[in-house]
UniProtKB/Swiss-Prot annotation:
Residues that bind GMP: 69, 134-142, 166, 186-188, 194
Superkingdom per UniProt: Eukaryota
Annotated effect of mutating G7D: In HRH; Gravesend
The UniProt record lists the keyword Metal-binding: yes
UniProt-reported outcome of changing C206Y: In LNS; Reading/RJK 1727
Protein name listed in UniProt: Hypoxanthine-guanine phosphoribosyltransferase
Length: 218
């Protein structure tokens, strides 16, 4: 049986790609330094993560819990791949979705003050296999707080899938179960990751420029 695939490690000296090689909205042309992870690579990696999730969690009802807002694109694409596996397998399992919204960033810094500002009744998680889907793990404090909250409802199992994990000295050491990409300590935007609500409409994961930070600063 194949083991879980490790995250794709992007080195600290990875230069990324010139913006001119990709389709970038004109209104962001001066606000980005480089394309860091192209959309096609994100999709291919997400497809493999779906297989890993089904292998580890596919024996019981799964509740997929999306962390809004940044996680919604990764969540939607990951679930599409999981549903395809469900349709084309001899063994399929029921899956439901739920949503929670957290707030921990101001400008480009994680504040460490985690606020739950939205979410449904999490009592539906009791006895279920819960897959928390997040866009990025930075310090890890937000996810540790959310895991403590979810475990109060006695789920059968809790696993975390994060598209990105940042290598940063601010990390508390938390690592998710399923990792798309491990990235350097850069502030990235796109593919629903935002800077003060901007850049969610980019398909690629990009590095924001100092011009972009200044323009959209809260």
């Amino acid at each position: 049986m194949a083991t879980r695939s490790p995250g794709v490690v992007i080195s600290d000296d990875e230069p990324g790609y010139d913006l001119d090689l990709f389709c970038i909205p004109n209104h962001y042309a001066e606000d980005l330094e480089r394309v860091f992870i192209p959309h096609g690579l994100i999709m291919d990696r997400t497809e493999r993560l779906a297989r890993d999730v089904m292998k580890e969690m596919g024996g019981h009802h799964i509740v997929a819990l999306c962390v809004l807002k940044g996680g919604y694109k990764f969540f939607a694409d990951l679930l599409d791949y999981i549903k395809a596996l469900n349709r084309n397998s001899d063994r399929s399992i029921p899956m439901t979705v739920d949503f929670i919204r957290l707030k921990s960033y101001c400008n480009d810094q994680s504040t460490g003050d985690i606020k739950v500002i939205g979410g449904d009744d999490l009592s539906t998680l009791t006895g279920k296999n819960v897959l928390i889907v997040e866009d990025i793990i930075d310090t890890g404090k937000t996810m540790q707080t959310l895991l403590s909250l979810v475990r109060q409802y006695n789920p059968k199992m809790v696993k975390v899938a994060s598209l990105l994990v940042k290598r940063t000295p601010r990390s508390v050491g938390y690592k998710p179960d399923f990792v798309g990409f491990e990235i350097p300590d850069k502030f990235v935007v796109g593919y629903a990751l935002d800077y003060n609500e901007y850049f969610r409409d980019l398909n690629h994961v990009c590095v924001i420029s100092e011009t972009g930070k200044a323009k959209y600063k809260a």
